[in-house]
């Protein structure tokens, strides 16, 4: 893995038998199915070893001085509302199943699809409808975080 000074990272296993991370300081972290994840500083030196032939990982990276990122792994059963504050950006990644954004002409989301949500004018919400599993990531400016 490349080193990225001043950057935070979060890795989440998407597919495969797993990934073992070996950090230079001796820490070992195993990402195992179905969707294990780990957050760490991009300043750290590490190597990754897949547990099988193929592994797929979602790699979120952000500048820690500029934004704060919160993530949630959630089931999607029916309707979920995502509340959007001005300046925030939400990543919705569909880990499994199908979903659609209500009140839009956007095509339905399938496993592996992602969508970015933003508040165009003031606080609002988007409604997701479907069934499956989601990874939600909220990106918020460090200046507005509590």
Specify the residue positions occupied by each region the protein language model found:
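Jelly-roll (double-stranded beta-helix
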Residues: 1-146
């Amino acid at each position: 893995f490349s080193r990225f000074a001043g950057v935070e990272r979060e890795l989440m296993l998407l597919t495969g038998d797993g990934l073992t991370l070996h950090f230079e300081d001796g820490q070992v972290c195993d990402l195992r199915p179905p969707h294990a994840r780990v957050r760490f500083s991009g300043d750290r030196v590490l190597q990754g070893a897949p547990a099988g032939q193929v592994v797929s990982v979602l790699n979120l990276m952000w500048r820690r001085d500029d934004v704060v990122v919160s993530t949630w792994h959630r089931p999607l059963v029916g309707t979920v509302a995502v509340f959007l504050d001005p300046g925030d950006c939400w990543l919705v990644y569909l880990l499994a199943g199908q979903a659609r954004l209500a009140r839009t002409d956007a095509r339905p989301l399938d496993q592996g699809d992602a969508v970015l949500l933003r508040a165009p004018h003031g606080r609002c919400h988007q409604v997701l409808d479907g069934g499956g599993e989601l990874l939600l990531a909220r990106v918020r400016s460090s200046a507005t975080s509590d």
